[in-house]
Curated annotation (Swiss-Prot):
Protein's UniProt keywords contain Membrane: no
Annotated organism of origin: Prochlorococcus marinus (strain MIT 9312)
Region (Domain I): 1-71
SUPFAM superfamilies tied to this protein: Nucleic acid-binding proteins, RuvA domain 2-like
Domain of life assignment: Bacteria
Annotated localization: Cytoplasm
Full protein name: Holliday junction branch migration complex subunit RuvA
Flexible linker: region residues: 151-161
Amino acid sequence: MISWISGELVELWQTNQKFFLLINCQGLGYEIQVLESLFLKLKTNQITNKNITLWIKHIKKEDSDLLFGFSSKDQKNFFIEILNIRGVGSQIGMGILSKFSISEVINAINTQNKKLICSVPGIGQKMSERLILELKSKFRNELKIQEEKSKDEFHIKDNKINKIVSDIELTLKSLNYTKNEIKSILPIISKEIDSLTKKEKDTSFENLLMLAMNYLDNDSSNIVR
């Protein structure tokens, strides 16, 4: 059983939507599939000939041995929990963790945001329902903590950004969107704001509000208002 691998990064490459590293560990070359976020970080920083450590999930098949590497033990454990769900394969698991952080997935489970889960390639309506149902039982404690922190989750230090988020939240409330609907859209709005320039942040309220409304109105799985 391989728990982790620590060695020299030799090469990194992409095959379709899969991202790989080659690591030299004591003279052996390990080909490891990693999350897109880690791959891009290493590629952007042009890091080679440097030691890195990855938490490993080893999947043995009839015709191959597959290694999946993660930068944290939490990511690895979350990946394993996803694989334990019937009908969910390794590429679905990698797709979920490549697109969202663990806290974002837990928030989507807590708010039953099926559309967010369905945005991962390969996940349809039925699979999203199964993922939410089964992960909700597996991460009951984490969901309770998430719910307790939800009120403070989006208190941002930048006053201008915090005001934009608060204004959007108040506007959505005035338009009769439910608390759960608003809670489900705030991580997306916050992520969108993070990508804006300083000039864009001064003029982005209307665009972000429209983004939120379009997202919620097009989500047929949301609770009826």
